[in-house]
Design a protein with these regions (language model features):
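Accessory DNA-binding and partner-docking regions appended to nucleic-acid-acting proteins
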Residues: 2-6, 362-666
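N-terminal functional modules and adjacent low-complexity/disordered segments of proteins
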Residues: 63-65, 289, 608, 640
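Helicase motor core with emphasis on the C-terminal RecA-like subdomain
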Residues: 2-13, 17-21, 25-37, 41-47, ...
Length: 666
């Protein structure tokens, strides 16, 4: 630990003369040993709130971050300032991971960054138990809360992990937390009200504009942006869209007008995305047209424009995305080209996540069957369970969390179902490195993991049975510990896959029908909340009161003060304050759905579904198909390749369901 004060560390290590608003309060509380939450506006310097204390705390600071991009940007910053920090992630080879673990165990490493999913890894948890940890940092902590806009069920387990690894305190970081989310976060980690530090969301350099979307939206964008893209003085710009195909179309239209724009979305391979991001960060490419896949962790100070070509997904998303503009403090513009035409697509995304009632029944039947076994253990391989129940991965995770909350199941542990190994020394030489009972144990391992060419698959049941016959402890835990030790020594390479979560069924005699109805009602309630979230966003953009003030009120920010020379409660630099409140144009009218050809559009899926499963699809599956919404069952059906897929993607999902009901009831 440094002998200097935090203020001196701020200057000597990070090169800053003064703390920014809220930072010193957070750092002081963390160094005093308090669990703390920092609710800072995007770009307000949340990361320093853990980076600086990490240098003063005696042991490791463990940072849980939702995205690899977030880790990489922060690691680059820390490396430039000489801070011993590293990550463990899925892109690394074994040697790199092993080196990071050794540095953490030795105390050399001050900061270790991981994804929340990494904590499900049995071997990684075993490693963490060998490391002393001073602080756990939860980045994007709003993911903890079901009231948040980006709820991630795995985050709910973080309080348990804090207890399991005996971590004395936590620091929660987020830019987008409403009062309900903050209360939820505080409760989960027992954070005192005085240890919640909020900086406020008002940024005086951001001009918030809302413009009604014109019929030719591309030309509207070109006319607005082109004067800012003169050669040699291009204004760095992010343009957000909803769909990948829109990103490609808009980027192409801008390029045709001489604006060097590139599309960025999840449909591009990772190398291409990294190259585009690098060009934007360096200033070689001034304009990015992106889905929300772009921007997390981006720390580019001179972004002059953030444009929402389509509606954002929520007020929280909007706040986070506009927060990427003007981090250098200079004037920047946030333009929303708003119309109701994109609302149906966003609403359909919400409906697409609601599981089938039959899928919930199937899920509960599996749990009930496991509850009837003597050990009441239920092993879950998420991909397989998603396929078997036809429930998407995220809603399925949420259902499992709900079942925990209902006291039906409880997570016990997770393990990699399959291990394989490759020797770097002769197996006989490996045995020869040990004596007595240990040598017999290693001989048992070698004899019971046959090698096919190069790799051998570990069969834990076979090893256990062989151990019982020879009166040798060959339990799964002991075998894994031994194999990891051999790998650490460089004697073999060990690989694991097929993460399996093990739950205990606490209440095996529940009523399947009653619980299924309750869970389905909860899913529908969540659906209504998300639809209301979209309506709240529309209300913001159509507001006749100051947009900046409305944003502050949404996040419970009582610190907003009107700038000098403006009316009370007005920012003076938004559309409303300029005297231009808007009424969002309605979506273009569509032909009556009653005139649509049911046979033409629905028959391809009906026929393939009947051939594959022996029965026609239900109305929910047909509606998903016609609206272009994916389901696990569509993968084996290759539904995306069928005529009719997404033919109604611009129509409201409930309308399509109602239209289908008229045919399916006949």
């Amino acid at each position: 630990m440094p002998s200097t004060s935090p203020q001196q560390t701020l200057k000597d290590v990070f090169g800053f003369d003064d703390f920014r608003g809220g930072q010193q309060a957070v750092v002081s509380r963390v160094l005093d040993g308090h669990s703390t939450a920092a609710i800072f506006a995007t770009g307000a310097g949340k990361s320093l709130c853990y980076q600086l204390p990490a240098l003063h705390l005696p042991h490791l600071t463990l940072v849980v971050s939702p995205l690899l991009a977030l880790m990489q940007d922060q690691l680059s910053f820390l490396a430039r300032h000489g801070v011993a920090a590293a990550s463990i992630d899925s892109t690394q080879d074994r040697e790199t991971t092993r080196d990071v673990m050794e540095r953490a165990k030795s105390g050399e490493l001050k900061i270790l960054m991981i994804s929340v999913e990494r904590l499900k890894n049995e071997r990684f948890r075993h490693f963490l138990r060998q490391v002393r940890i001073s602080l756990m940092v939860v980045d994007e902590a709003h993911c903890l809360s079901e009231w948040g806009h980006n709820f991630r069920p795995d985050y709910l387990k973080l309080p348990d992990y804090q207890h399991d690894f005996a971590i004395p305190q936590v620091l929660l970081l987020t830019a987008t937390a409403t009062p309900a989310v903050i209360a939820d976060m505080r409760e989960k980690f027992a954070i005192a009200p005085d240890n919640v530090i909020t900086t406020g969301f008002y940024r005086s350099n951001l001009e918030l504009l809302v413009a009604p979307a014109m019929e030719d939206r591309q030309q509207q964008l070109i006319d607005w942006l082109k004067p800012q893209m003169l050669p040699g003085s291009e204004a760095p710009t992010i343009i957000y869209v909803t769909l990948q195909q829109t990103a490609e179309q808009v980027a192409k239209a801008l390029a045709a007008q001489g604006i060097a724009a590139q599309a960025y979305h999840a449909g591009l391979d990772s190398e291409r995305r990294d190259a585009i991001q690098g060009q934007f960060m360096r200033g070689d490419s001034p304009c990015i047209v992106a889905t929300i896949a772009f921007g997390m962790g981006i720390d580019k100070g001179n972004i002059r424009n953030v444009v929402h070509y389509d509606l954002p997904k929520s007020i929280e998303n909007y706040s986070q995305e506009i927060g990427r503009a003007g981090r250098d403090g200079l004037p920047s513009t946030c333009l929303t080209m708003a119309g109701r035409d994109g609302l149906r697509v966003l609403e359909n995304f919400v409906y697409g996540d609601t599981p089938e009632y039959a899928g919930i029944i199937r899920l509960l039947e599996e749990i009930a069957a496991a509850g009837g076994q003597p050990d009441r253990q239920w092993e879950v391989l998420l991909f397989t369970l998603s396929r078997d129940t036809n429930i998407r991965s995220l809603p399925l995770k949420t259902l499992l969390v709900r079942l925990e909350m209902h006291g039906i199941i409880a997570p016990r542990f997770a393990f990699l179902a399959e291990y394989r190994l490759r020797y770097h020394i002769e197996p006989s030489e490996l045995v020869g490195r040990f004596e007595g009972e240990r040598a017999a144990f290693v001989r048992l391992i070698v004899d019971n993991i046959p090698i096919a060419r190069t790799w051998g698959t570990v069969d834990f049941d076979r090893l256990h049975n062989a151990g019982q016959a020879q009166h040798i402890d060959a339990s799964r835990a002991r075998v894994i510990t031994a194999l990891e030790y051999f790998q650490d020594k460089g004697w073999l390479t060990l690989e694991g896959k097929r993460m399996t979560d093990v739950y205990e069924v606490l209440q095996p005699n529940f009523s399947i029908e009653a619980l299924a109805s309750q869970l389905f009602d909860e899913c529908r309630h969540r659906e209504r909340i998300e639809i209301e979230r979209l309506q709240a966003m529309l209300a913001l953009f159509e507001s006749e009161s100051c947009l900046t003030r409305r944003l502050a009120e949404h996040f419970g920010d009582s610190t907003f003060d009107a700038p000098p020379d403006t009316e009370q409660g007005r920012c003076g630099h938004c559309s409303v304050c300029y005297g231009h409140p808007v009424r969002l144009p309605d979506a273009p009218p569509l032909a009556a759905l009653s005139d649509a050809d049911f046979v033409r559009y629905a028959t391809p899926l009906i026929e393939r579904h009947a051939h594959q499963f022996g029965q026609p699809p239900n109305a929910q599956r047909l509606a998903h198909f016609l609206c272009g919404l994916t389901m696990p069952v569509f993968t084996p059906l290759k539904a995306r390749s069928l005529d009719g897929f997404a033919v109604f993607e611009q129509r409201a999902y409930p309308e399509v369901r109602e239209w289908l009901a008229g045919y399916l009831e006949c």
